[in-house]
């Protein structure tokens, strides 16, 4: 975990202001978390700000310690104009694939906002949102754009809390500390106990678990949403 540094410029409203100058009335920042996890949902947060100065120290969630991130999330929740979460379950990820699962989660988040945005800023190079919104992709947006930085913090804290709840239900997989991502503890639990109902069964980690490999499913790209067991 990398802490925020005073040498890194704080996020700005530059991209949001460009979109507003181009005609957007409301701009939302989006960030996702959970894309690379073996277990748990992929989650997207959409955040709308009002142009006021952000909480001091706001930055990409990955640059904050867990304690600082939790404190920052409390400040962000009371500061933003609105925010909402959308998620796609492991079963939806298995059925749709990650790109479409991200799109589904993003649309759920945007549809749940109290104010409908005209344009959205997405962290990274790829537009996983699509119509009907105007989408601006921006590399390192979670570090440089105020609304995306806010979404980054809220998304990470919210998903971590969900995974901590799963840890209480399925102890031993390290969900509370590893959030469903690969780790030695997670691998050992999978080898001994197999996947839980919250694991993604279409992912290749199951190929390395001979005892549980029969549970892996594959998605038939020729038949949308069709799953079958791996032979």
Swiss-Prot record:
One annotated GO biological process: DNA replication, removal of RNA primer
Cofactor: Mn(2+); Mg(2+)
Molecular-function GO terms, alphabetical: manganese ion binding; RNA binding; RNA-DNA hybrid ribonuclease activity
Catalysed transformations (reactions): Endonucleolytic cleavage to 5'-phosphomonoester
SUPFAM superfamilies linked: Ribonuclease H-like (SSF53098)
Binding site for a divalent metal cation: 31-32, 123
PANTHER family: RIBONUCLEASE H2 SUBUNIT A, RIBONUCLEASE HII
Protein name in UniProt: Ribonuclease HII
